[in-house]
């Protein structure tokens, strides 16, 4: 995976940044904005990560149930059809490049 190097401001916890080229993170980060990410950090329910999935490399909101099933929700609920479920036997191979650093958490979808 390759992307243009975007400088990360000092004083942030981010390790790298990527340009947001669509509305997948709206309304929190708009198209044309910058997403700041932190590598090698544990994900908790509600965290947004940059994942490698069958659909490509995408931003998704993470949630795992007590059985080990992982749910990756589209942050922009206009794209709810892009939500995916990863069964426990495949969840261990899920690749996350980093957790999105935000000032406020994004609520998990209720639909």
Residue ranges and their predicted role:
Residues 8-111:
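Acidic/glycine-rich C-terminal interaction modules and beta/coil loop segments
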Residues 1-5:
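Extended boundary segments
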């Amino acid at each position: 995976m390759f992307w243009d190097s975007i400088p990360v401001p000092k004083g942030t916890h981010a390790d790298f940044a990527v340009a947001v080229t669509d509305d997948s993170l709206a309304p929190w980060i708009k198209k044309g904005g910058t997403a700041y990410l932190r590598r090698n950090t544990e994900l908790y329910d509600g965290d947004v990560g940059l994942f490698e999935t069958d659909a490509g490399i995408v931003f998704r909101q993470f949630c795992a149930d007590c059985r080990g099933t992982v749910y990756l929700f589209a942050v922009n609920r206009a794209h709810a059809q892009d939500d995916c479920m990863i069964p426990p036997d495949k969840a261990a191979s899920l690749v996350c490049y980093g957790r999105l650093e935000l000032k406020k958490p994004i609520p998990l979808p209720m639909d």
